[in-house]
Amino acid sequence: VSIIPTGGAGGYTMPLPERDEMYNTKGKMLQDITVDLGGRVAEELIFGDITTGASQDIKQATALARAMVTQYGMSEKFVLMGLESRESMYLDNGSVLNCSDETASHVDEEVMRILKEAYEEAKRLLTENRECLDQISAFLIEKETITGKEFMEIFHKVRDEANEYHQEELIFAE
């Protein structure tokens, strides 16, 4: 993760693949959407307001949620339906929904449902881990970039401190 502005972006997150995956699972895609929306949630939690900074993340989350619904049959409403097809590469290789206007409206509703659920999950996770969020934010303000290893070190340190605090709380309660 970097907060150094590059190429018109205010910062950049590049997840490294944990292993070679030819196919993504529904669960993994939902996690990716949740991560994509984490920046917007963090803005709300920290600043009490939102900015344009998460626009690319929102675009990416929306595209992934839409693909889950229209291409991969990974939604509750359209389980076994492929609703989207790719146009010829001579026509900009765009995609076309192969459904009625009413079904397209339901697709939009399903995409919004997926995004809202992922947003609420990101909010829950960041609220529960607020101390970690604050420490990682402070690290980024100082260093401008954080590696996955540095991120996990901070995460485990905060978790260990929280566990120690709760252990002491239990001892004093007895």
List each language-model region with its residue ranges.
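Soluble catalytic regions of large protease machineries
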Residues: 1-174
